[in-house]
């Protein structure tokens, strides 16, 4: 929803296993604050083409494409990127690798590295993480053409040059506060 050329635009990116309609409560809250909102489905999610995700690696290209389109349509609008989990990782990677330069970011339940988050998922299921987590990260990266061990949103965050709001809760069963 466009609230006019002077309203900041918030581009909202969903998490893994989700799609943009699940971000409607957040979008409604942002609209209630007078902001313009654009909801995006990552490749392989919701109404987008593709049949797999890369937990933020290739999705960073989707972030960059959404930002490019938004800047072309609303060149004077302040730009805020909001991402949940994988969406937060994709935003951080886009800033780091694609030189995306938002005016601010909101990062909810961001994980620090792909390997750490996979290990934590195994632990949450009460399954030994080693060597399964390492094999999963290796295999997933190999299968989809990237180095999963190098996917480190915490490292990408060092490239942020804008205000950042990190949201996280102790009750999150998927991403630990330590991450």
Where are the regions that the model predicts?
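Short beta-strand element of the alpha/beta-hydrolase
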Residues: 7-15
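Hydrolase active-site cap/lid region
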Residues: 93-149, 155-156, 162
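Short beta-strand/loop motif that positions the catalytic acidic residue
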Residues: 159-161, 166-168, 172
């Amino acid at each position: 929803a466009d609230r006019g050329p002077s309203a900041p635009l918030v581009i909202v990116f969903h998490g893994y296993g989700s799609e943009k309609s699940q971000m409607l409560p957040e979008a409604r809250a942002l609209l209630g604050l007078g902001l313009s909102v654009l909801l995006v489905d990552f490749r392989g999610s919701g109404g987008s083409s593709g049949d797999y995700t890369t937990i933020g690696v290739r999705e960073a290209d989707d972030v960059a494409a959404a930002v490019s389109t938004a800047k072309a349509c609303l060149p004077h609008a302040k730009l805020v990127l909001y991402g949940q989990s994988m969406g937060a990782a994709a935003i951080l990677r886009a800033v780091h690798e694609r030189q995306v330069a938002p005016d601010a970011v909101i990062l909810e339940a961001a994980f620090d590295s792909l390997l750490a988050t996979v290990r934590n998922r195994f632990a949450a299921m009460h399954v030994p993480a080693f060597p399964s987590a390492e094999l999963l990260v290796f295999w997933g990266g190999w299968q989809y053409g990237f180095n999963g061990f190098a996917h480190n949103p915490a490292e990408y965050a060092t490239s942020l040059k804008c205000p950042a709001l990190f949201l996280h809760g102790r009750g999150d069963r998927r991403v630990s506060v330590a991450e």
